């Protein structure tokens, strides 16, 4: 047994081992030791000596040396360099195991790279594991993993696992495949029993991924390998050394339980030269030898509880029976292609109990469910049930005749049932259901047990819809029961055509809450909805029955007497404009109210009088409206500077008046001085004070008088310009004199206003023009619409 950090060879063994290989004599002897227990991913201590020129084993190696002797570390390092190129090529997939496992798991090099610790392996006497060339049909390996065997006398089994191999026949020799099974004994395997309980029904297809995931994480377990045996393993010594495989079994048991764990999916196609008698003899030798070894292991102090393994054995037996049943029904395709490629064999891994069953009793959860679904679908679809693609006597597809009586909302989960029997008959009912057979097939759907249907819906989570096919009544309970057990069973019975979906969505159950509520909402607006229903009924009376018309008929019949009373009131709505105003004819709509709010910021009319000369500028004229908006903007800009100018004039006015008063005072004083040479200073001062107060009061009133004069001038200009504008635009007023009376001027202004809209003075424009004295505001959009209407009325008269 190889122990870490030290070698147990003597000097004579080392010299004899060096002398057996010529290619290694030139390499200097180097022996190193370390006591570090760190896991190494590049340990090659267990590799056998090979000859690199022809890829065959050194046969003298087994003769000169005992199998239990250990190879030194320098040879392992040399072999590492020798097989480095082969290790690179071993990381690819082979055709025989596409989608199953990588070929790198078959190589001994990869196994040693994956090994967390350098545990020993049982060794075979005559055969090894490795690359088997297909061309020469050689039974020898290019590479073989030398397993440093633990002798039966050794008592240290705590750090090392025990591995052995067995080869048996499965189920009375029906399949003659050589099996190599690795059973492992380690204390850490107790924690794997719970994991086996969870994965006991999995298929052997998914154990590859489980081994790949666990190979990099479990530090206490040995390297991983896929057990692929060699064709000829008939040595009694081989089976004698491989007796560790059933040390967990009881004394009265033999190896058939372990034989059941082997499946055809992971076995290699054997060569036909194997004899059945030799195998049975080997099995007997194996069973007797395993009991002796089991007793020796228990004496060695390897305290391993047998209860978990007994429980695990039962679990594996259940999985083995399922897998064996599967292998008998479906032959493995990987075995047929296996010998087409060169592959690398490796011994069994020492990882866990899950790998003991060798990808046979465990499988992925998803694949298990998929296989179970396939088996259940086989039960669901017997031979007497016609498929979805079958057609009846007349050549119509059976799915076209099917209309379900329920709908399941995928977003809310609400189920809506359509109890009306007429909803099942679609537009093809009159043509297809002529014979009694088709009607009977339709009646079988209606006569199904609703209790079973609801129970299956609650358990399965989706509605189970029956097919409109023969014998659907006898097969539907099976579908419902399976759907209640497994909610992942895909049901493709629901018709996915656009017409059927539309019909199903439009069908509302009067008994359901949602359907009754929607019917009440529709019948509240009886004016417009009853009009549509009455029109549809009149149109569909002569036409053939369609799903849409049937729904209108059923909905109208379910509406009640209130809807029938209101049917006469809806007859007066014969135009689309009145239909829009069905809620209230005189009431303003929301859009109209928004327009009124928008018009509040628009410019109001100038005055409420229409008999003046300026009536042309009222809101009825679009051009006048635009001109007024332009002038109003200019006037508002001028008005901004009114207050600053007024204040500036008020500041300047006292200065001007003060200078005038001073001049007048000087002239007055000169006259007084000439007339009165005497001194009258007191009286002059009083007069000056009196005039100054009067001047100030006059100056205060002067700006208001000036503004009044300005307003009078502006109003005169406005009136004169309005009269000139009215005279220039109206061609009739050119021949008239200005001495006309007030009535003539009023009629002229009316004609001028009409001519702005229509050049020929048509009276039709007056009808479409707004009332001038109304104070309702307008917008440009309203005025343009009115102008366009008047323009369209005047166009035929111009032609």
Swiss-Prot record:
The lineage of its organism: Eukaryota, Fungi, Dikarya, Ascomycota, Saccharomycotina. The modification Phosphoserine is found at residues 84, 104, 107, 115, 144, 203, 215, 290, 397, 575, 707. It comes from the Eukaryota. Residues 147-156, 213-224, 244-253, 332-346 have a biased composition (Basic and acidic residues). The gene is TCO89. InterPro entries: TORC1_cplx_su_TCO89. Residues 18-41, 97-171, 201-284, 324-391, 418-476, 538-568, 663-685 are annotated as: Disordered. It is a peripheral membrane protein. Disruption phenotype: Abnormal activation of TORC1 signaling. Abnormal punctate localization of TOR1. Sensitive to high hydrostatic pressure (mechanical stress). The keyword Cell membrane applies. Component of TORC1, which regulates multiple cellular processes to control cell growth in response to environmental signals. Nutrient limitation and environmental stress signals cause inactivation of TORC1. Active TORC1 positively controls ribosome biogenesis via control of rRNA, ribosomal protein and tRNA gene expression, and rRNA processing. TORC1 positively controls protein biosynthesis by regulation of mRNA stability, translation initiation factor activity, and high-affinity amino acid permeases that serve to provide amino acids for use by the translation machinery. Residues 348-363 have a biased composition (Low complexity). It is found in: Cell membrane; Vacuole membrane. Residues 97-126, 233-243, 254-269, 420-429, 461-476 have a biased composition (Polar residues). One of its GO terms (biological process) is TOR signaling. The modification Phosphothreonine is found at residues 52, 82. This is Target of rapamycin complex 1 subunit TCO89. It comes from Saccharomyces cerevisiae (strain ATCC 204508 / S288c).
């Amino acid at each position: 047994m190889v122990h870490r950090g030290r070698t147990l060879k003597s000097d004579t063994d080392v010299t004899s081992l060096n002398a057996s290989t010529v290619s290694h004599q030139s390499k200097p002897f180097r022996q190193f030791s370390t006591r570090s227990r760190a896991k190494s991913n590049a340990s090659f201590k267990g590799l056998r000596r090979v000859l690199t020129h022809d890829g065959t084993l050194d046969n003298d190696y087994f003769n000169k040396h005992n199998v239990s002797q250990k190879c030194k570390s320098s040879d392992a390092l040399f072999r590492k360099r020798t097989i480095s190129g082969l290790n690179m090529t071993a990381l690819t997939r082979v055709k025989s195991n596409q989608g199953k496992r990588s070929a790198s798991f078959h190589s001994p090099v990869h196994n040693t790279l994956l090994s967390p610790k350098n545990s020993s392996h049982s060794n075979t006497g005559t055969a090894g594991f490795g690359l088997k060339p297909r061309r020469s049909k050689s039974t020898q390996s290019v590479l073989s993993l030398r397993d440093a065997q633990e002798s039966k006398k050794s008592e240290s089994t705590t750090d090392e696992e025990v591995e052995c191999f067995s080869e048996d026949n499965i189920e009375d020799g029906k399949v003659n495949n050589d099996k190599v099974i690795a059973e492992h004994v380690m204390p850490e395997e107790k924690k794997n029993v719970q994991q086996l309980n969870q994965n006991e029904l999995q298929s052997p297809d998914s154990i590859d991924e489980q081994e790949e995931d666990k190979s990099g994480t479990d530090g206490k377990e040995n390297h991983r390998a896929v057990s692929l045996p060699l064709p000829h393993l008939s040595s009694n010594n081989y089976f004698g050394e491989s007796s560790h495989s059933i040390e967990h079994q009881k004394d009265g048991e033999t190896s058939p339980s372990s034989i059941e764990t082997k499946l055809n999916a992971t076995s290699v196609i054997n060569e036909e030269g194997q004899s059945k008698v030799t195998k049975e003899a080997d099995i007997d030798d194996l069973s007797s030898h395993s009991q002796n070894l089991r007793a020796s292991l228990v004496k060695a102090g390897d305290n391993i509880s047998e209860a978990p393994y007994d429980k695990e054995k039962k679990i594996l037996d259940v999985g083995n029976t399922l897998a064996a049943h599967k292998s008998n029904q479906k032959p493995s395709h990987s075995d047929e292609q296996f010998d087409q490629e060169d592959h690398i064999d490796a011994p069994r891994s020492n990882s866990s109990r899950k790998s003991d069953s060798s990808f046979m009793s465990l499988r992925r959860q998803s694949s298990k469910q998929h296989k179970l679904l396939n088996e259940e679908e086989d039960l669901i679809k017997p031979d007497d049930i016609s498929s979805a693609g079958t057609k009846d006597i007349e050549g119509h597809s059976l799915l076209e005749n099917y209309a379900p009586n329920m709908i399941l909302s995928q977003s809310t989960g609400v189920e809506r049932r359509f109890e009306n029997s007429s909803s099942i008959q679609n537009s093809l009912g009159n043509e297809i259901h002529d014979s009694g057979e088709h009607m009977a097939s339709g009646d079988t759907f209606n006569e199904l047990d609703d209790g079973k249907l609801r129970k299956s819906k609650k358990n399965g989570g989706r509605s189970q819809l029956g097919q409109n096919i023969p014998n659907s009544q006898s097969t539907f309970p099976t579908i419902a029961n399976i759907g209640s057990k497994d909610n992942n069973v895909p049901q493709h019975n629901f018709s996915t055509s656009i017409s059927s979906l539309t019909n199903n969505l439009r069908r509302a159950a009067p008994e359901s809450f949602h359907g009754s509520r929607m019917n009440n909402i529709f019948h509240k607006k009886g004016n417009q909805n009853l009009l549509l229903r009455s029109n549809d009924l009149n149109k569909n009376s002569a036409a053939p029955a369609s799903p849409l018309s049937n729904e209108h008929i059923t909905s109208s019949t379910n509406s009640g007497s209130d809807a029938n009373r209101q049917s006469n009131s809806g007859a007066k709505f014969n135009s689309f404009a009145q239909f829009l105003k069905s809620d209230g004819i005189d009431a303003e709509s929301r859009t109209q109210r928004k327009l009124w709010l928008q018009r509040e910021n628009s410019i109001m009319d100038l005055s409420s009088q229409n008999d003046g000369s300026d009536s042309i500028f009222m809101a009825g004229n679009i051009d006048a409206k635009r001109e007024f908006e332009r002038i109003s903007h200019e006037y508002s800009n001028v008005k901004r500077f009114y207050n600053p100018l007024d204040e500036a004039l008020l500041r300047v006015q006292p200065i001007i008046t003060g200078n005038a008063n001073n001049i007048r005072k000087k002239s007055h004083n000169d006259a007084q001085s000439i007339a009165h040479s005497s001194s009258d200073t007191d009286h002059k001062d009083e007069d000056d004070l009196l005039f100054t107060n009067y001047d100030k009061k006059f100056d205060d009133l002067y700006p208001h008088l000036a503004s009044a004069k300005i307003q009078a001038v502006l109003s005169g200009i406005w009136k004169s310009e309005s009269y000139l504008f009215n005279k220039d635009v109206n061609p009739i007023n050119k021949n008239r004199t200005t001495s006309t009376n007030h009535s003539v001027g009023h009629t002229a202004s009316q004609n001028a206003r009409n001519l702005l809209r229509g050049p020929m003075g048509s009276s039709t424009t007056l009808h479409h023009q707004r009332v001038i004295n109304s104070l309702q505001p307008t917008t440009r959009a309203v005025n343009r619409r009115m102008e366009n209407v008047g323009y369209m009325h005047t166009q035929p008269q111009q032609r």
